[in-house]
Amino acid sequence: MRTSQYLFSTLKETPNDAQVVSHQLMLRAGMIRPMASGLYNWLPTGIRVLKKVEKVVREEMNKGGAIEVLMPVVQPAELWEESGRWDQYGPELLRFEDRGNRNFVLGPTHEEVITDLVRREVSSYKQLPLNLYQIQTKFRDEVRPRFGVMRSREFIMKDAYSFHTTQESLQATYDVMYQVYSNIFNRLGLDFRAVQADTGSIGGSASHEFQVLASSGEDDVVFSTESDFAANIELAEAIAIGERQAPTAEMCLVDTPNAKTIAELVEQFNLPIEKTVKTLIVKGADENQPLVALIIRGDHELNEIKAQKHPLVADPLEFADETEIKAKIGSGVGSLGAVNLNIPAIIDRTVALMSDFSCGANIDGKHYFNVNWERDVAIPKVFDLRNVVEGDPSPDGKGTLQIKRGIEVGHIFQLGKKYSEAMKATVQGEDGKPLVMTMGCYGIGVTRVVASAIEQHHDERGIIWPSDEIAPFTVAIVPMNMHKSEAVQKYAEELYRTLQSQGVDVIFDDRKERPGVMFADMELIGVPHMVVIGEKNLDNGEIEYKNRRTGEKEMISKDKLLSVLNEKLGNL
């Protein structure tokens, strides 16, 4: 490709509304342009990267035995009504009517469509297992699209769905897809973790997220220092260690009129924060017990995903408002505690090991100090309620936990029979009777993968693609002052034709631009290998080579240039 025949839309300045590095660099590199909130045009440089990511995904999925299909973006409402998600899905689901007043949606996901397709096409257990995938546009009407294509309303996703007669068959395909995803992200050169995860609105049982580690990530990824354990913080089990110590002081009621938060209590009374507890009131699952207290240590954070799995707690978790709390307990939120509490309470495992702690007295402006379980208050139900923190023991007993930010780029689920039962997707079983199929689903955010690679691999000059496979071009030819030097132009043209004939994805910068501009643009878009042709060096029989990833520069004899490039690219 010649730059003179290419839409090369780089920007010198960073747009003011771009908050994260990937958004900034994708705009500056001429990969994307905004059209409306959460909607982007993909320009030639961006589409080249996108298609190369799709190629890797497609090749690895095919190797794993999946079969490609393509399903409509527009889906009839009847399928969503049949699955039950028409009423369950929130405003992210864009609904509309056609001119016949029939309801449709723009698909945020395709479980209903694929289940309908398979129940029509597959009739016998002999046709299973079956794993179908597509690479298709999705639309979710995000309330606040942000971070460029990282969280846009329209995006491209690879979604696969497998169908089985048994849980064992599903597990086998799930294990294959786990390895396929690992192969994809390794091939793309990404630093990632496969972590245990919550199934969320998709439903099902077992689930793993594939998280690219990056400081701009929205998720907290937890992993062990000494084992393969890794989990999303929502699912990571918090292990409480040690034993509860014997009381050392009598419980006392203290006036605390100006201490309505843990921070204020700690500061005003010089208390160790790990000797305080906080009490949070949430809605109960049982109408006879409409409010439930959740009690965690003062320096810990409530894990809402864990909490809503307790049978006493409403799912999804909902906090009670201050009016409800005041009416039932008699005090405001700043004075709540375990002593003399008139609603069911659940305490975190760490709290169960505490002694001589401080908590609200359920009287406005008062706290109890030196509270001890069993002596001053009966120990309530104990449950894992908190987020883990760095240094906690790993749940597998090996090492301690570290926490890093992550960007979710892939997610695999064991759906079970959630959709197949609702939509009566059956096959004839081995015994001749109808058998409800068991399902798995497996998604990769293709557009998000592009942004994640940039978040993880960049410098002050621009993008550094982690793999040559996904760079927009593999080699850049930069001839300095070519239009003033016949020798430079001739050599550059010959090299360009040779590389093209050998299948190298090469960009030839034939613009009438200053060398500094040409270098800056090629570094900005992240071309991994740059060949710089200057008249003086050419007279000496040498060509300059630059490696974008390592920063390496070297002079190479022009007679050996192709063999050296062959070694560096490994595919000439």
Curated annotation (Swiss-Prot):
Gene3D superfamilies referenced in this protein's UniProt entry, alphabetically: Anticodon-binding domain, Bira Bifunctional Protein, Domain 2
Q: Name one GO molecular function term.
A: aminoacyl-tRNA deacylase activity
- What InterPro entries does the database record attribute to this sequence? aa-tRNA-synt_IIb (IPR002314), aa-tRNA-synth_II (IPR006195), aa-tRNA-synth_II/BPL/LPL (IPR045864), Anticodon-bd (IPR004154), Anticodon-bd_dom_sf (IPR036621), Pro-tRNA-ligase_IIa (IPR002316), Pro-tRNA-synth_IIa_bac-type (IPR004500), Pro-tRNA-Synthase_IIa_type1 (IPR023717)
Enzyme class, spelled out: ligase
Q: Where in the cell is it found?
A: Cytoplasm
Primary place of residence?
cytoplasm
Q: Name one GO biological process term.
A: prolyl-tRNA aminoacylation
**One GO location term (cellular component):** cytosol
Q: Does the keyword Ligase apply?
A: yes
Give the EC number(s) under which this enzyme is classified.
6.1.1.15
UniProt keyword list? Aminoacyl-tRNA synthetase, ATP-binding, Cytoplasm, Ligase, Nucleotide-binding, Protein biosynthesis
PROSITE patterns referenced in this protein's UniProt entry, alphabetically: AA_TRNA_LIGASE_II
> Which reaction equation describes what this protein catalyses?
tRNA(Pro) + L-proline + ATP = L-prolyl-tRNA(Pro) + AMP + diphosphate
Q: Keyword Transferase: yes or no?
A: no
Its family?
Belongs to the class-II aminoacyl-tRNA synthetase family. ProS type 1 subfamily.
Q: What NCBIfam families does the database record attribute to this sequence?
A: PRK09194.1 (NF006625), proS_fam_II (TIGR00409)
User: What function does this protein fulfil?
Assistant: Catalyzes the attachment of proline to tRNA(Pro) in a two-step reaction: proline is first activated by ATP to form Pro-AMP and then transferred to the acceptor end of tRNA(Pro). As ProRS can inadvertently accommodate and process non-cognate amino acids such as alanine and cysteine, to avoid such errors it has two additional distinct editing activities against alanine. One activity is designated as 'pretransfer' editing and involves the tRNA(Pro)-independent hydrolysis of activated Ala-AMP.
Give the record's subunit note: Homodimer. May form a tertiary complex with YbaK and t-RNA(Pro).
Domain comment from the record reads as follows: Consists of three domains: the N-terminal catalytic domain, the editing domain and the C-terminal anticodon-binding domain.
The identity of this protein, by name, is: Proline--tRNA ligase
Q: Which organism is it from?
A: Haemophilus influenzae (strain ATCC 51907 / DSM 11121 / KW20 / Rd)
